[in-house]
Amino acid sequence: MKKIEIPALYKKWHVDRGYELESLFEQLTEQFDIRSVLYPGCYVHITPSFYIPRAVYVDMELPAKKFFDDPSVLEYIESRKTYKEKSEVTFYHQSYEELIDEPRESFDLVISQYAGFISEPTKRYLKKGGVLMVNNSHGDAGLASIDKDFNLVAVFGQSGISEKNLDQYFIPKKKTEVTTKYLKDLGRSIGYTKTASNYIFEKVT
């Protein structure tokens, strides 16, 4: 059998740094029956494709475009996938704030990690009942927590996905009126009394 090499950029940014998030994606797909994912600001984080058959990636960076243009990346995904179907991977070399050529409400999952306020401009592509997986590195989880279109349904931490004590999250440490404008003007996360590494919101409207 042909040995499939780990793509260099993926190895550098995710394998070597221990940031593949395999456990998170495995649990997400099992618990929420996810078959399609949109990942804006992905750079070269292809781990979702190991667990989800249809993946659409969006990033402005030129190295990301070169990465996804390389046929060996899809070969690597095929070598690590955990489902029977053929992997379907699409990449858009553009800003996630611009419209992409995908139907509205066509994805089971939208991912927001380290690329700013992703949830607001991309939620149009998320199905009602679909989920947003988001961290709070740039304040996007905080933004989702006050968005009427989203409802917090789980968090992810060292013990895995949990649905316990969700009302204890997104309570500001300081007495601050948290609004969309406040978070966007700040451009980063604020301090909360209880936190998780990732938050899972269901799109309810």
Regions of interest found by a model, annotated:
Residues 1-35, 45-46, 178-186:
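Class I SAM-dependent methyltransferase Rossmann-like catalytic core
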Residues 129-142:
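Conserved beta-strand signature within the Rossmann-like core of class I S-adenosyl-L-methionine
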Residues 20, 41-45, 113-118, 136-139:
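Short beta->alpha connector loops
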Residues 168-205:
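Core SAM-dependent methyltransferase catalytic element
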Residues 124-128:
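Conserved helix-to-beta-strand junction in the class I
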Residues 86, 93-110:
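A short acidic, Gly/Pro-enriched loop at the edge of an enzyme's catalytic core
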Residues 25-82:
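SAM cofactor-binding core of SAM-dependent methyltransferases
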Residues 139-140, 144-174:
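Conserved Class I S-adenosyl-L-methionine
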